[in-house]
Curated annotation (Swiss-Prot):
Position of the signal peptide: none
Protein name: Protein dom34
Keywords: Cell cycle, Cell division, Cytoplasm, Meiosis, Metal-binding, Mitosis
Main localization of the protein described in the UniProt heading: cytoplasm
CC cofactor: a divalent metal cation
InterPro entries assigned to the protein according to its UniProt record, in alphabetical order: eFR1_2_sf (IPR042226), eRF1_1_Pelota (IPR005140), eRF1_2 (IPR005141), eRF1_3 (IPR005142), Pelota/DOM34_N (IPR038069), Ribosomal_eL30-like_sf (IPR029064), Transl-rel_pelota (IPR004405)
GO molecular function: GTPase regulator activity; metal ion binding; translation release factor activity
Function of the molecule: Component of the Dom34-Hbs1 complex, a complex that recognizes stalled ribosomes and triggers the No-Go Decay (NGD) pathway. In the Dom34-Hbs1 complex, dom34 recognizes ribosomes stalled at the 3' end of an mRNA and engages stalled ribosomes by destabilizing mRNA in the mRNA channel. Following ribosome-binding, the Dom34-Hbs1 complex promotes the disassembly of stalled ribosomes, followed by degradation of damaged mRNAs as part of the NGD pathway.
PANTHER family the UniProt entry points to: PELOTA, PROTEIN PELOTA HOMOLOG
Amino acid sequence: MKLIQKNIEKNGSGWITMCPEEPEDMWHLYNILQVGDQLKASTVRRVVKVGATGSTSGSRVVMKLRILVENMDFDTKAAQLHIKGRTTEYHPEVKMGSYHTLDLELHRNFTLYKNEWDAFALDRVDAACNPSRNAEIGAVVLDEGLANICLITDYMTILRQRIDQVIPRKRRGDSSAYQKGLDKFYDSVFQSINSEFDFDKLKVVILASPGFVARGLYDYIFSMAVKLDLKQIVKSKNKFVILHSSTGHIHSLNEILKDPAVESKLADTKYVQEIRVLNKFYDVMNEDDRKAWYGPNHVLKAFELGAIGELLISDSLFRSSDIATRKKWVSLVEGVKEINCPVYIFSSLHESGKQLDLLSGIAAILTYPVDEEDISEDEEDEESQNFEHS
């Protein structure tokens, strides 16, 4: 994302003009946008004009419209963002207050207006506009005839291509048809990664499969790279890591990225840090479940008790259309940061984020054990007081 201009008042209101430069930027915007914000962007509308004789003619006109955001839709596969709302600014070709859907496009500026730019939104803008942010992991998760070619960024796992081919079975005494089919499959995967991966920018390229399929692909890639004199691939040979996975499906990525061979190369990346702390949470919960809490009420109570050591929270919680709910999570994150405890904001588009969402989207590793009875008693006391007041 490119930051074009920024104007934030002391009370937190203001606007920011940005330009999305890659598909992941649309995911950032989806997390920044809220119902009630205003958005100004270029769009195309069909304008009908009536001539002097009563005849009509229509043409498609590019115009800038400003709308009050009522609804948002993010297409994860196409990485496209559609925002619906009523127009709030005069335009000679568009009736004020009419509904329109803005489809944000790459390399087209837009301006976002908010009554309050909270800490989460501003941090997300900073992350999106960080020039060092790029895809750092290329991954091929495969099995015989099936391959998922992925790019993994800090915030998204992008499935660039899925290859599904039928490979003939081995016949007793004759495996030529099988080998021919396997080589054809390997070649399809090779062509895909050659076009989808920028090997100069990637830190690591993972080939993972059950059995020896990944090893076979590795051998095929480098035999072809040498044969075709593809220097970019040849000089990136030390970036390739061959790993075992239980399946050839994309959900095996979490299991794959736990491997020490990958962790050592990607220790400083956001995605690997998220996987590591989520695994730590599960380990702590297995050892002493009084030191690992999840769920909104339990985590908020742990914060009140000053017991949070590490906070795990999904970005899905910040997409609440209820302003008070969003403020509650922003306040919690800021409060935990103020006591110098680490906060991990998981992307719900990563497998680790999806796992956290299954735990209600929020969890905490505590600095000391807290019995569930203590929290339950406090909740009962609060309910009793509320009943007495009512």
